[in-house]
Amino acid sequence: MSQRPDTIIIGAGIAGLATGCYAQMNGYDTLILEQHTIPGGVCTAWRRGGYILDGCIHFLMGCGSDQGFHQRYREVGALEGNRLIHAEHYLSFFDESTERSLTITRDLDRLAHDLRTLAPADGGFVDRFTVGIRAMQGYDVDVMQARSLMRPVPAPVHLWNARHLIPHFAGNRISLEALGTRVRDPFVGWAMSNLFVPEAPVPFIFAVLAQLTLGELAVVEGGSLNFSLGMARRYETLGGQIVYGADVTEILIENDRAVGVRLSNGAVYRADRVISAADGYTTIFELLGGRYTTRSIRARYERWPLFAPLLLISYGVACEFPNVPPTSVIRLQRPLSIAGQTKPRLVFRVFNYDTTLAPPGKTVVQVYIQTDYDWWEALRKDRARYEQEKARIAADVLERLEHHLPGIAAHVEVTDVSTPHTFYRYTRNYRGAFEGWLVTPRTIRHALEHALPGLQDFYMIGQWTEPGGGIPVVIDAARRFVQTLCHQDRKPFRTEAEVTAP
């Protein structure tokens, strides 16, 4: 690349890497500045004592070879050298008080049968729910089209292209939490509310479960970092350059134009345009000093709901649990007490399906608990208490897991606890929100602006401009963004997808 790139991209997360790939494909000379020592942002994994602990992908949508998202993954190199492990299960629900359970697999007929058995008075609901899933089978999910269909008045072209889906979108512009209230059976209602975050719109879960039934949900063997490393390799092969350990502290402005950035070490990089794929709040209110905002932008960061920050508790275990579903949601008989809050639910994953993450005969178990950001930020100032609380929670959670994974406590070799501050420290995500704006029936309708008012040659990309975030969404958004740049510069948009399928 030349000494001075025409485009600087802040952040080598998925959005930054995808933007860089598509920009390089189209003749732009780009430089990515990343504050961490590795690419990927939230899409990462790390090693502890012979175990690989995955911090990101629960399921990757659009992994069918004929899916548009699958083509996007290939275009940006995410699948090159990586093997996909296709999901056979989605979630298993268990209520400790009643010992009732429900497991959702690829078999939609089995799901319908199990729901009717559990909730015989809810037959009408079961029919509508499974019809909604079937309607999405074979449908190539398009972000813009789905977003349009969730609006009160969808765009005519989207109405026509997805006309068979209209009844399922129009009648379900509600959250999963609201869906659960329509079920008479309390256990099934609870399960419906917890199919994803309770605030998520129902059509989203129709799409997820439809892809599950067709074998189009997957994870990347070896952990999420492999996905990111594939994209970084692709970007560098296309001529792009990544500078690691580059902590951007200021976006340089001249005459209301972005002309470069300054790093924490004083180094300055200049370019014709600056694209921030970093945290939205940090970008707008710190790197730009809050100079280019509107009332609506400020209100968004003050009031819009965020994905709740997480406690991620990982155990490297010297045994396997071959008959346990990959992901379980437990309704606890004795709620946990964490960060001053009562937690009646426990979600855990068992990584038996990926033998590369642990030595032979061993596996990784991970627990996810939503928690309070401010509580942990206050506690971390007292390092001793911070570490004590992490250890207390890890021990308490392990005791609860023993009921569901007999023998686990005696075989734990590694324990690792990530708090909301850990997420913030490694990714700078606002208030530890790992996926940005919470996906709700309201927020999913919006595609937010890439530019800021009054500022030229500057753009934002990533989960803070795409409510709900997620890997396929931000890759697709990066592709559309570079298409827009090409249109502005009067050049044809092109891609260079790998010819050989992974």
Go through each PLM region and give its residues.
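Extreme N-terminal leader/targeting segments of oxidoreductases
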Residues: M1-T7, M25-N26, F493-P502
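N-terminal glycine-rich phosphate/pyrophosphate-binding loop and immediately adjacent elements
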Residues: Q3-G138, L438
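A conserved FAD-binding loop/helix module that cradles the flavin
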Residues: I57, Q463-C486
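Short loop/edge segments at beta-strand edges and connector loops
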Residues: H86, Y244-A246
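Active-site/ligand-binding neighborhood in enzyme catalytic cores
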Residues: R134-L238, G245, Y426-P441
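A glycine-rich dinucleotide-binding beta-alpha-beta segment and adjacent secondary-structure elements
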Residues: D185-E199, V347, G407-P467
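Mid-domain catalytic core of redox enzymes
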Residues: V219, T249-P360
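C-terminal segments that line or cap access tunnels to active or ligand-binding sites in enzymes
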Residues: A318-H421
